[in-house]
């Protein structure tokens, strides 16, 4: 009996050793891939190497799920003719900016032509100058208007969200969309497979039965694992009849109406756009939809790109970023805005984990006399991200940056306002995930009134916020310091 046990133990040791050796070899292969085969920052390389070294059995699994980079040419393919048409618009606008004969005399457009040119050149983010914008900071008002616009649709509704919850608000909106589909309106929903995992097929049955079309972005081909879970479509876009567009931070669900016991009031920022910028949102939706739809592709007919007479005069560029792009366009837009600041910078972001160069640009502005204000949440939805955000924001205090914690629920707003003149609102957080891994979309706005409105929203939020002073930060416990340190170490892969 003892001899049998000895043989069994010997065989089990051989099996365990084989598993460890196999895991070690896999980790080496993945380490080799990270260092030599993929384009990454040095910080990201070191973070993944630490994971692979200290988690030899699970490191390669984490890398498969969260670390793999997708080749750009495997994501989106734009027809040559469509690309040629877009390039023609961009070339015309670049020439106009270079010759200083742009048809619109908007002061902001003339002053910030270098930034406009950068977004044009890197992202084909063509400039539109005839827009009218409405700013939302409250979910109830935003969804009331959205539902009314859905009810008024006559031709088509293109509806894209990262999260669509299968709850009261989610079902209400899906029901309204289904009604329009029954009336003969073309209704297409594009949802992220991970973000909307509570919805997926069952929650969409009534909508589809009424004639609506829905597609998942990067759906999992395996029952429990999504090997593309690290690259999610975080965009929120609605286009109605080519006349009205929505873009911003709100997802669809009761949580975003302030009904979550965990988060309470949900503070976010969203835009309703009427004008030619809607065409840019439409183009982004079509590219995303056609990349995922196996059939039922959307054409580039004039029907989807009508002339819009908004009566507005606001300049807007719609910029996208994601792993399919060569440049980190939204990040570059943020950096260009920050470097142009002369008087003030107002930032709201739930996740503030940029790279050191980004942090240095903010420090340089503050040390140069610019009034820099940053607002972050005071409660975590993702603990590691929360502590890394706190440490990064606090690192700016010595440079004179003022940091505020939003105390009235959860802050999810992604806004940047410079000198009461230009602003950005969209889906991109100020972190590595938004800049590099996820698919994002932002509106860059050249208008004093909108910039002042967004700045005033920040100032109004100060009434329900608390300042993070150096003295207050110095009193944090050793346990918090430890959590900050670990989170900071992992921040390149959060």
UniProtKB/Swiss-Prot annotation:
One Pfam family cited in the UniProt record for this chain: PLDc_2
Task: Report the superkingdom from the record.
Answer: Bacteria
Against NCBIfam families, the record matches this protein to:
bac_cardiolipin
User: Where, by residue number, is the active site?
Assistant: 234, 236, 241, 412, 414, 419
Q: Where is the PLD phosphodiesterase domain?
A: 229-256, 407-434
Membrane topology qualifier: Multi-pass membrane protein
Keywords recorded for this protein, A-Z: Cell membrane, Lipid biosynthesis, Lipid metabolism, Membrane, Phospholipid biosynthesis, Phospholipid metabolism, Repeat, Transferase, Transmembrane, Transmembrane helix
What name goes with this protein? Answer: Cardiolipin synthase 2
Record's keyword annotation contains Transferase = yes
**What family is this protein classified in?**
Belongs to the phospholipase D family. Cardiolipin synthase subfamily.
Q: Which GO terms describe its biological process?
A: cardiolipin biosynthetic process
The reply on keyword Oxidoreductase is no
Q: Name one GO molecular function term.
A: cardiolipin synthase activity
Q: Which reaction does it catalyse?
A: 2 a 1,2-diacyl-sn-glycero-3-phospho-(1'-sn-glycerol) = a cardiolipin + glycerol
What's a GO cellular component annotated to this UniProt protein?
A: plasma membrane
The transmembrane residues are 14-34, 45-65
InterPro entries from the UniProt entry:
Cardiolipin_synth_Firmi, Cardiolipin_synthase, CLS_N, PLD-like_dom, PLipase_D/transphosphatidylase
Q: Give the subcellular location.
A: Cell membrane
Q: What class of enzyme is it?
A: transferase
PANTHER family, sorted: CARDIOLIPIN SYNTHASE, PHOSPHOLIPASE D
Briefly state the protein's biological role: Catalyzes the reversible phosphatidyl group transfer from one phosphatidylglycerol molecule to another to form cardiolipin (CL) (diphosphatidylglycerol) and glycerol.
For this protein, the Enzyme Commission number is 2.7.8.-
Organism per entry: Staphylococcus aureus (strain MRSA252)
């Amino acid at each position: 009996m003892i001899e049998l046990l000895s043989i069994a133990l010997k065989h089990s040791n051989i099996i365990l050793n084989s598993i460890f050796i196999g895991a070690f070899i896999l980790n080496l292969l993945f380490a080799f891939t990270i260092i030599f085969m993929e384009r990454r920052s040095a910080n990201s390389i070191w973070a993944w190497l630490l994971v692979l070294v200290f988690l030899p059995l699970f490191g390669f699994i984490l890398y498969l799920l969260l670390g793999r980079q997708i080749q750009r040419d495997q994501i989106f393919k734009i027809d040559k003719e469509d690309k040629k048409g877009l390039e023609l618009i961009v070339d015309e606008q670049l020439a106009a900016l270079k010759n200083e004969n742009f048809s619109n005399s908007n002061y902001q457009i003339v002053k910030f032509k270098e930034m406009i040119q950068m977004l044009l050149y890197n992202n084909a983010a063509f400039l539109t100058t005839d827009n009218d914008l409405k700013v939302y900071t409250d979910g109830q008002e935003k969804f009331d208007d959205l539902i009314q616009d859905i009810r008024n649709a006559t031709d088509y509704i293109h509806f894209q969200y990262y999260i669509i919850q299968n709850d009261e608000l989610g079902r209400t909106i899906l029901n309204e969309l289904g009604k329009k589909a029954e009336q003969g309106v073309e209704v297409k929903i594009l949802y992220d497979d991970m973000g909307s995992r509570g919805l997926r097929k069952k929650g969409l049955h009534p909508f589809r039965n009424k004639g609506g079309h829905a597609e998942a972005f990067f759906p999992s081909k395996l029952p429990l694992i999504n090997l593309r879970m690290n690259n999610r479509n975080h965009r929120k876009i609605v286009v109605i009849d080519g006349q009205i567009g929505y873009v911003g931070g709100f997802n669809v669900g009761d949580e975003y109406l302030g009904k979550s016991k965990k988060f309470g009031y949900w503070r976010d920022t969203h835009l309703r756009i009427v004008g030619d910028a809607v065409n840019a949102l439409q183009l982004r939706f079509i590219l995303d939809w056609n990349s995922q739809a196996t059939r039922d592709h959307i054409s580039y007919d004039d029907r989807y790109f009508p002339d819009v007479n908004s009566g507005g005069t606001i300049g807007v560029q719609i910029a996208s970023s994601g792993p399919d792009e060569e440049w980190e366009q939204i990040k570059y837009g943020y950096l260009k805005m920050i470097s142009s600041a002369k008087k003030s910078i107002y930032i709201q972001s739930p996740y503030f984990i940029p790279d050191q160069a980004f942090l240095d640009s903010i420090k340089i502005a503050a040390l140069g006399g610019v009034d820099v204000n940053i607002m972050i949440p005071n409660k975590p939805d993702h603990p590691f991200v929360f502590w890394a955000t706190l440490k990064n924001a606090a690192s700016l205090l010595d440079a004179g940056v003022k940091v505020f914690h939003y105390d009235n629920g959860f802050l999810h707003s992604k806004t940047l306002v410079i000198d009461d003149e230009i602003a950005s609102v969209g889906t991109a957080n100020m972190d590595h995930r938004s800049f590099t891994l996820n698919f994002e979309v932002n509106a860059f706005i050249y208008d004093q009134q909108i910039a002042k409105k967004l700045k005033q929203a920040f100032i109004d939020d100060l009434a329900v916020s608390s300042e993070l002073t150096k003295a207050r930060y110095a009193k944090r416990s050793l346990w918090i310091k430890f959590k900050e340190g670990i989170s900071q170490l992992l921040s390149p892969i959060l």
